[in-house]
Curated annotation (Swiss-Prot):
The lineage of its organism: Bacteria, Pseudomonadati, Pseudomonadota, Gammaproteobacteria, Moraxellales. The keyword Repressor does not apply. Belongs to the radical SAM superfamily. Biotin synthase family. It comes from the Bacteria. InterPro entries: Aldolase_TIM, BATS_dom, Biotin_synth/BioAB, Biotin_synthase, Elp3/MiaA/NifB-like_rSAM, rSAM. It comes from Psychrobacter cryohalolentis (strain ATCC BAA-1226 / DSM 17306 / VKM B-2378 / K5). Its cofactor is [4Fe-4S] cluster; [2Fe-2S] cluster. Pathway: Cofactor biosynthesis; biotin biosynthesis; biotin from 7,8-diaminononanoate: step 2/2. This is Biotin synthase.
Amino acid sequence: MSALLNITEPNNNTNSNDNDFLASLTTDAPQAIASKYSREQIAQLFDLPLMDLLLQAQTIHRQNFNANEVQISTLLSIKTGNCPEDCGYCSQSGHHRDKTKLVAEKRIEVDKVIAAAKRAKATGSSRFCMGAAWKHPSAKDMPYVVELVKEVKALGLETCMTLGMLDTDQAAQLADAGLDYYNHNLDTSRSYYEQVVSTRSYDERLDTITNVRNSGINVCSGNIVGMGESRDDRIDWVHELLKMPKAPESIPVNLLVPIQGTPIGDKVLAEGQLSVLEWIRTIAVTRICCPSSYVRLSAGRESLSDAEQALAFMAGANSFFYGDKLLTTGNASQSGDDRLMRELGLTKQFAAPRAPKQVPVIDAMSGHQSQVVLAS
């Protein structure tokens, strides 16, 4: 594993322990140091000058992935609205339906889901994600979702589901069906969580993630940036990922889409939205701390410029949702995504990622030889 570029400079306001940590980014293999990150060290990463942070994140990204290849997923709502949870950002909550005016829909028939999966595969998605607005799937729902997993996998697609909380038996059923990923976001820090949701505890979210992990299904778990939380909350969220026995294989970093009629959406619309650059910082720190995870651009891309999305990829994102809709919110258009990928020189990942190619590079200033990873 290669060493990172040494970008630290003497700073009279930084103590020696801080300098030692930042210097370690230039000498330690990312996988070796990730589990050592303390909360204070994660905070130091957030505080780096943005260009330095992006350089570190992109270098680590290239050590673990093909830098110019992205994984494409498509997301379909298989049961929409009237959710019993009170998530303050979500239009699907039954608690907000009088204000959001979202029309609830029953479960989609299996054949219609399969038709959507076929369309997703034809346009280049390698993973098909299915979401249902439930607190948890009921016993009568399990045969339905198990059938969906089997039918979608038969098309040659990876499968992902987000259905709310799972107990150990439900996780085992989905694992037996062949489910590849299960999404259950932490959303934010433990301390800010009570400002977001009251009908499901933070520990219940962690319990579901544990049940998924123990079943052998890959974990997908991320956050929503821009709900009124502080940077400290974003630091705590990253630290929470590192407390897990293993970091999630897939980490969606959502940028809040404020929906009128939801408590958090109304608050953000009134007070102003978070800087996109802070979202990009969060992506970069996530990439550094979770070097082998896929970091996905999820909600919020529709409002971003090409340059902002390019910075997100520079920060280490290597996956995004493809399609004009994410559950009930808009998404960047497929034609726009195709054009952006062409302009950035990005290609779609259709199979298992190839091993990165390393080449020796001599630092002109020090004469030190290191390895730089090129796209294969």
